[in-house]
Amino acid sequence: MKKNAFTLVELLAIITVLAVILVIAVPKIINTIKDAKIGSLKSSVILLAKDAEEEYGIRDAKGTLDQVKNPIKCEDVANIDDTYDKCQIKFDKEGNATVLLNANEKSKFGKIGCVGTKSKVECDNGEMTLSKRCTTPDKLEYNLKFVDGQYTYTYNGSTGWSVVLTDKTSTDPVTTELCGTINEKPIANMKSMFKDSKAESIDTSSFDTSNVTNMGGMFENSVATSLDLSSFDTSNVTTMWGMFWGSKATSLDLSSFDTSKVTAMGYMFYYSVATNLNLSSFDTSNVTNMSNMFQESKATSLDLSSFDTSNVTDMVGMFYSSAATEIKGLEKFNTSKVTSMSHMFDSSAATSINLSNFDTSSVTSMDSMFNGSAATSLDLSSFDTSNVTDMNAMFWGSVATTIKGLEKFNTSKVTNMSSMFYASKATSLDLSSFDTSKVTSMGGMFWNSKAESIDLSSFDTSNVTDMKRMFQNSAATTLDLSSFDTSNVTDMSSMFYASKATTGYARTQEDADRFNASTTSRPSGLTFVVKS
């Protein structure tokens, strides 16, 4: 007989079997569905990455995603994976940044923070920090630091600045376009543009410098050993102050420079390591400041024959510690407007300096002018010192054995002669024309001087207060101080210490007693007497 329905026992058995089947099968079914979704998601991600790569990426020869192009906006990549090792940053003329990041060959887009309209963008993976700002329409400010890496600047007139950075752990470049033409005009201010730059190469071949007026400090402390500036248009430049200060360029050919509008060349080659400087085309007719221009420069010779110095007022430290053993063109210098020559040849390596045409009638300071100079002789016969007030250390350590023209010096306005001939190698000093009536300090004036003969017959020391160490270790055998009035002197300590003098004359017995009073600082063989 046909059975029409399941018994209760049979139903329970069926339900039990189905329950067992569900318990066993459902997880597998769920996993299968999940795997399908993940597979679909992976496919979507792969397609998205491929699309992104096609729009933004550039693969290298090995197929590795190497570089990015067509950057997207900061906000478009925000809140996505922040792991990255490459980035491209662009700035528009308002200072807004657009960024694309790529991480570890995984085609990921990272995130980056954009701060305001003057965007500061930092790419930091422990190796580099990049910060760049474009501010006012005519001024370029920067702060670019790259730790233990290398970067190279290039310029394109249509796209602007480009900087290629190479991390110390990688050879892959990171291309970052910085500020280019601002308001669609060529930059007029290149002041300090490559200051402290660690770029080993600076390509300026496409520079448009036709509107530039300021190149002050442009390559200051730049480590680039070679600079090709032949394409520079400097026709509108007015200041080159410190332009190559501390530059590591080994040679500088500036023969194409138009310097006709330049007024400031102070510190231009300060601490420059360039051993060769081609300045043959320099027009310096408008230059007013040449202070420290070649200080510590490593140029072995200087040809300044083309220099027109008729408007220069400041030559302070111009050749201070210059390595040039020869300086051509000094005899052509027009120095009629120069007011300060302090330290001008201080520690200069030039063994011969022709100052025959120097007009020093406007000079007020000759402080340390020949301090440590390597010139073996000095002819100052043309010097007009009538307005000089400071001759402190003027010949300190000078190796010149002869100094011509001292007998013509007009020192009527000089107030400071301290250390004037300290350690000077001059064997004889004719100071018979010296008017020292306004001098207040003569401390160390002849300390360690090698002059065996010193004519002090015209010295008026009535206003001098300091004679400390004045003749210490002086080689002069006779000290005729019979013109000296020491009534206002407050310090005579060590005045004759280790002096080689054996004969001394004083104006009055009171002066003689003062000179003889110190037995500790006066040689035992030197006794001062009143000159009859």
Where do the protein language model's features map onto the residues?
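Short, well-structured alpha-helical interface segments that form or flank functional binding sites
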Residues: K3, A13, S43, K185, ...
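Periplasmic/extracellular, small/polar-rich flexible segments of pilin-like filament-forming proteins
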Residues: E54-K132
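Negatively charged
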Residues: D124-S532
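Membrane-proximal N-terminal amphipathic helix
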Residues: K34-K62
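N-terminal single-pass transmembrane signal-anchor helix
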Residues: K2-I29
